Swiss-Prot record:
EC number: 6.1.1.6
Entry keywords, A to Z: Aminoacyl-tRNA synthetase, ATP-binding, Cytoplasm, Ligase, Magnesium, Metal-binding, Nucleotide-binding, Protein biosynthesis
The keyword ATP-binding belongs to this UniProt entry's keyword annotation: yes
Binding site for Mg(2+) 2: E427
Name of the gene encoding the protein in the UniProt record: lysS
Any single Gene Ontology cellular-component annotation: cytosol
Keyword Translocase: no
Entry protein name: Lysine--tRNA ligase
Cofactor binding mode and count: Binds 3 Mg(2+) ions per subunit.
MF term (GO), any: lysine-tRNA ligase activity
Organism this protein belongs to: Vibrio campbellii (strain ATCC BAA-1116)
Family that this chain belongs to: Belongs to the class-II aminoacyl-tRNA synthetase family.
Record lineage: Bacteria, Pseudomonadati, Pseudomonadota, Gammaproteobacteria, Vibrionales
Assembly notes: Homodimer.
Length: 510
């Protein structure tokens, strides 16, 4: 028997076993419906305690102290294990056991025996402690609140299919403690960032999710159609241009935490919809943003995890202290010590396209015909340096032709006052001193339109209203976007974005 045939046989047997269990549970539910008024789904049980709180408050008390207290509680949750008279009940704060003594089992024998793993029940009783020191509820009464018709995966074959974890996240969250904790951390990260920004006098705002003109980043947009207006609209790829309009309007410090949508491929680091925090700060430059980012990230790590040092894969990353800062040009040279062409490269050579194409091909970059010198430099960096940036690093010196919204450097107008922040071998944030010269922005938008006409479908559109806003005067401003999903990946030591997005994009099953 081949492995494929054997696997198919195992799957068929598992499916048959699952169908049998489902049929048995449906029969139990039918019997319950005939014997109660709530059609098998009562809604009058109210819990007054959570497992986690009970463990904190009573976990250290002795068996004798608990017996003397005779503290009666009402708990509710999902049955995760059933071992004779003991049930393990799980809810949002943790797990606790419930014990049905012989008297309870005698009175409620049929009802108790009908309970299955996965059922949701409510239990009332006094807190006790087992001989092993485990806290439990001595069941005085219980009520079946929801009959689970499908067994949990461990019951028949285990949740071993990684893709199924993402398709049926509800099952993954029931059986996988690591998954639950990842999303608890995510929630705490969002709260910590929001609180930090508010303490720095930033105002939280909301900008449109549907745009008439997509802008704020170089990416392919999702296109929809507005029936009433009979016009195409675009899901936003970034909120940047709207946020800067607010700075023009007089809100000097604004931030937004929300979704962006980009019609691009899937990868361990990319999902078509993702969460960003973008903020803009008048009368500041990109160097001040780097300082603020160091403070923000170390603060978030400390608040969420209790430490600025944490494992990531085989490495340990450190969010505390001062982060490394180097230009993209310096990073390429630093991480390619044995590449003769790169070591001989000067900043002036970057504008020699033939030379840059030669170097790019030598490091296995597949070059597109419409790429500019700046794009070639970025691709060489991404191929040879980015994966090696495990510790917090700011990369500066981004060329203007790949930074259409960033202010040009006063020292060399080929470059901009822009940085990207890397940690764990990936980009997590992008920031720069904003371009507030309306005429320069007009010229760069036109260059983007030309690039789009030449085949670059990620190039930006021309936004005339944004030019009008700049003509009213944008004060010197710095702005930044931080990828929440990638940050959470680092803080949870996970290596695919699907593990930190509750419902990631998936191809429909056949």
């Amino acid at each position: 028997m081949t492995d494929a045939v054997q696997n198919e046989t195992v799957q068929e047997a598992s499916a048959q076993e699952e169908n049998k269990l489902i049929a048995e549970r449906r029969a139990k539910l039918d019997a319950i419906r005939k014997s109660c008024k709530a059609n098998g789904h009562p809604n009058d049980f109210r819990r007054d305690a959570l497992a986690g709180d009970l463990q904190k408050e009573f976990g250290e008390k002795t068996k004798e102290e608990l017996e003397e207290l005779n503290h009666v509680v009402a708990i509710a949750g999902r049955i995760m294990a059933k071992r004779g008279p003991f049930l393990v009940i799980q809810e949002t704060s943790g797990r606790i056991q419930a014990y049905a003594d012989k008297a309870v089992q005698k009175v409620l024998k049929e009802k108790y025996q009908g309970l299955d793993i996965g059922d949701i029940i409510g239990v009332k009783g006094a807190l006790h402690k087992s001989g092993k020191g485990d806290l439990y509820v001595n069941m005085e009464e219980f009520e079946l609140l929801t009959k689970a018709l499908r067994p949990l995966p461990e019951k028949f074959h285990g949740l071993t299919d990684q893709e199924m974890r993402y398709r049926q996240r509800y099952v993954d969250l029931i059986v996988n403690e690591d998954s639950r904790q990842a999303f608890v951390v995510r929630s705490k990260v969002m709260s910590a960032i929001r609180n930090f920004m508010i303490t720095k006098q930033f105002m939280e705002v909301e900008t449109p999710m549907m745009h008439v003109i997509p802008g704020g980043a170089s990416a392919r947009p999702f296109i929809t159609h507005h029936n009433a207006l009979d016009m195409p609209m675009y899901l936003r790829i970034a909120p940047e241009l709207y946020l800067k309009r607010l700075v023009v309007g007089g809100f000097d410090r604004v931030f937004e935490i929300n979704r962006n949508f980009r019609n691009e491929g899937l990868s361990p680091r990319h999902n078509p919809e993702f969460t960003m925090m973008e903020f803009y700060m008048a009368y500041a430059d990109y160097k001040e943003l780097m300082d603020l980012t160091e403070e923000l990230l170390s603060s978030v790590a400390l608040e969420v995890l209790g430490s600025t040092s944490m494992p990531y894969g085989d490495d340990t990353v450190e969010f505390g202290g001062t982060y490394t800062r180097m230009s993209m040009f310096e990073a390429i040279k630093h991480y390619n010590p044995d590449h003769a062409q790169i070591q001989a490269l000067t900043e002036e050579d970057i504008q020699n396209r033939d030379l840059m194409v030669s170097i790019a091909k030598s490091v296995h970059v597949e070059v597109e015909s419409f790429w500019t010198c700046g794009q070639l430099l970025e691709e060489i960096f991404g191929e040879t340096a980015e994966p090696k940036l495990m510790q917090p690093t700011f990369i500066t010196g981004y060329p203007a032709d790949i930074s259409p919204l960033a202010r040009r450097s006063d020292d060399n107008p080929f470059f901009t006052d822009r940085f990207e922040f890397f940690i764990g071998g990936r980009e997590v944030a992008n920031g720069f001193s904003e371009l507030n010269d309306a005429e320069d922005q007009d010229a760069r938008f036109k260059a983007q339109v030309e690039a789009k006409e030449s085949g670059d479908d990620e190039a930006m559109f021309y936004d005339a209203d944004y030019i009008t806003a700049l003509e009213h005067g944008l004060p010197p401003t710095a702005g930044q976007g931080i990828g929440i999903d990638r940050l959470v990946m680092l803080l949870t030591n996970t290596h695919t974005i699907r593990d930190v997005i509750l419902f990631p994009a998936m191809r429909p099953q056949a």
